[in-house]
């Protein structure tokens, strides 16, 4: 573009770095599930997090790859269009993500188990990522407790809130898996990838926690539209 290779542009470099970090986080989370299963420990919650995160992050990576290819992304010979199509179904197969998030969120609310912290027992290059992880962990614990007190058993009817809590936990879990993997390998590459992955995941998780405060209003506004939406559908014969 403009006589320069795409990789020379900082915007492209940032996108590719984030894609690589997402792949690292996906691999880390799947490895974590496998290791726990090998120890014959329960993988129910962790496997849910891996399924949701990996199916959504992989599709996002493929979508960005199509964008970077430009019009060539739609040409079958490049292979990325097929990756995008095939990647989309994974959010539905083996349990739709929306349903899994409800189950996972309700599990978090009933478990009352504090989220583990990483502290400072990590490589110096991961201190920032570990601090971001621990801030999110404490924020999630506080938000879960506030939700329990505010809604009690009625929280099962607050699906938007429950899903946002679960998404914050998925981000936290993927960030922790990334940091722990990099701490074990201690290679410069893994440390750099884990830092990008964990910082981004924790920022996303914090946004989901912020969104929980707006969940009731979002649900109310959506409910107000239902009459028009379904009336329009009936008029159209649907």
Where are these regions (language model features)?
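Alpha-helical interface subdomain recognition
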Residues: 1-238
């Amino acid at each position: 573009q403009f006589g320069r290779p795409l990789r020379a542009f900082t915007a492209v470099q940032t996108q590719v770095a984030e894609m690589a970090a997402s792949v690292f986080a996906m691999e880390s989370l799947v490895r974590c599930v496998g290791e726990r299963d090998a120890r014959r420990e329960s993988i129910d919650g962790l496997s849910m997090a891996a399924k949701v995160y990996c199916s959504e992050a992989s599709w996002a990576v493929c979508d960005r790859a199509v964008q970077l290819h430009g019009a060539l992304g739609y040409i079958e010979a490049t292979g990325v269009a097929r990756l995008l199509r095939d990647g989309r179904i994974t959010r539905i197969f083996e349990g739709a993500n929306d349903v899994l998030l409800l189950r996972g969120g309700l599990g978090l609310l009933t478990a009352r188990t504090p989220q583990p912290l990483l502290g400072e027992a990590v490589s110096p290059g991961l201190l920032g990522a570990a601090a971001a992880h621990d801030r999110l962990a404490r924020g999630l614990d506080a938000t879960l407790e506030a939700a329990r007190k505010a809604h009690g058993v009625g929280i099962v009817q607050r699906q938007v809130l429950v899903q946002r809590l679960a998404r914050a936990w998925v981000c936290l879990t993927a960030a922790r898996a990334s940091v722990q993997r990099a701490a074990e390998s201690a290679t410069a590459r893994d440390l750099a990838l884990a830092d990008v992955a964990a910082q981004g995941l924790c920022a996303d998780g914090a946004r989901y926690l912020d969104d929980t405060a707006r969940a009731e209003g979002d649900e109310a506004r959506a409910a107000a539209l239902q009459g028009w939406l379904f009336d329009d559908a009936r008029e159209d014969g649907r």
